[in-house]
Amino acid sequence: MGEGLGALGHSMRVGVVFPQTELGGDAAAVRAYGQRVEELGFTHLLAYDHVVGADPAVHTGWAGPYDVHTTFHEPLVMFGYLAAVTTTLELVTGVIILPQRQAVLVAKQAAEVDLLSEGRLRLGVGLGWNAVEYEALGENFTNRGRRLGEQVELMRRLWTEQTVTYDGKHHRVSGAGLAPLPVTRPIPVWIGAASRPALERAGRLADGWFPMMSPGPKLDEARDIVARSAIAAGKDPSAIGMEGRITWRGDVRQAADELAQWTAAGATHVSVNTMGAGLRTVDEHLAALAAVAGNIRV
């Protein structure tokens, strides 16, 4: 049992956002971070995903939040590593940009991580926004939303059936399957959502969703869209999880206030993001999280 949050037994699951952009290429820092947040009692570690960054010198007027100089560890590979050095920490992609990847290969990679971690993977997926990245990976940027639904459907079948035949508009499998299958059958799939089509997709397809807005009227409207889409698909909206995000600004009271807002909004999970707070080392990130774990009571 952890020292802080995880030892409190509350239904809200409080995790962390792995500081992808601020830890650099240090494997020891990745290990230290994963082990320490588990010790502190956080329930899960969420990692963002970008395979390549755009070079602003080539892409004139580039205005994206990340570029070719921004560090990103590949989430599923990193999770294979973290699975070996942690024991209870849930490993969450938040989100992996699914349509720029091959669905069957992602299903295989996810199954392997779930197996090696003994059932600790939660696969968050989304569409992404970077056309440069799609081009580099040889995938179509313009139809990514239409393809994602098929990808989720196909992956779930691959995780639960020994052999699969699937004939979709964008994907085809003829009598093939994964071995070994994952521990969790199927692996939970969560969807990052902001637009109405994405919110409807989350309600229709997902086990949970990541809102791209803060608690308030816009979140209330988004939750209603997700719920109505779930009902139309014959699903129970109350069974769909929702994960909010707390932004660390150096103030435990403010973090506690944000947690209370997400709790009131109906979140089942939250994650604490320490990126962008001026923290320079893994130890500084962990010190901030220790303050959160030691003072927030959930």
Residue ranges and their predicted role:
Residues 1-298:
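Active-site-adjacent structural elements that line small-molecule/cofactor binding pockets in enzymes
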